């Protein structure tokens, strides 16, 4: 249930540095980091059930699905699934010419976005979107963004 992706862009995240330093437990090296990748499907595995096709533009992010059976999943807390597979940590990520990813990890890139624009949305974009979504702020409200690092900069977009 995997696809091979020709990587066109991969954003840099602080988690990639943590991966490089070996601070995530259980990482097997060598490992290519990169969990904010975008590119084109190069090959589709025989057992892929969703109708992904070669040539489709896709992106892969931090969260790539859940097992549905562990304690976290049974509580509905899918993001903390015991068996989650994270690109760049569980398997080689997007800091390579090609990567192999679970088909369940893919997001289709809209035509109006380039790979360079789409890749950072897969972690930094989701992180800042969820912060705003959960803040209670509404259209027209004034908000303060503290810090203008990578996430603060993305939030300003």
Q: What does each of the following model-derived ranges do?
A:
Residues 1-10, 23-71, 105-116:
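Glycine-rich beta-strand-centered segment in the early N-terminal region that forms part
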Residues 10, 16, 61, 73-76, ...:
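Cys/His-rich metal-chelating microdomains
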Residues 13, 40, 144:
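Conserved Rossmann-like nucleotide-binding pocket used by diverse enzymes
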Residues 15-21:
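Cytochrome P450 core scaffold surrounding the K-helix E-X-X-R motif
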Residues 16, 132, 156-157:
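Generic hydrophobic/aromatic pocket-lining and core-packing "Φ" positions
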Residues 66-146:
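NAD(P)H dinucleotide-binding glycine-rich loop of Rossmann-like/cofactor-binding domains
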Residues 127, 151-152:
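Hydrophobic/small residue at the entry helix of a nucleotide-binding pocket
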Residues 142, 154-157:
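Terminal helix/beta-alpha structural elements that buttress the NAD(P)+-binding lobe
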């Amino acid at each position: 249930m995997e696809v091979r992706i020709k990587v066109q862009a991969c954003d840099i995240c602080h988690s990639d540095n943590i991966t490089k330093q070996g601070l995530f437990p259980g990482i097997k090296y060598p490992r290519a980091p990169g969990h904010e990748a975008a590119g084109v499907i190069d090959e589709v595995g025989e057992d892929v059930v969703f109708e992904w096709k070669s040539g489709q533009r896709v992106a892969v992010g931090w969260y790539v699905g859940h097992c549905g059976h562990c304690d976290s999943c049974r509580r509905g807390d899918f993001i903390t699934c015991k068996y989650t597979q994270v690109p760049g940590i569980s398997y080689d990520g997007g800091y390579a010419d090609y990567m192999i990813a679970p088909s369940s990890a893919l997001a289709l890139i809209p035509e109006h976005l380039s790979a360079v624009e789409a890749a950072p949305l897969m972690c930094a974009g989701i992180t800042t979107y969820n912060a705003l979504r959960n803040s209670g702020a509404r259209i027209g409200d004034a908000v303060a963004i503290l810090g203008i690092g990578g996430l603060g900069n993305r939030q300003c977009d």
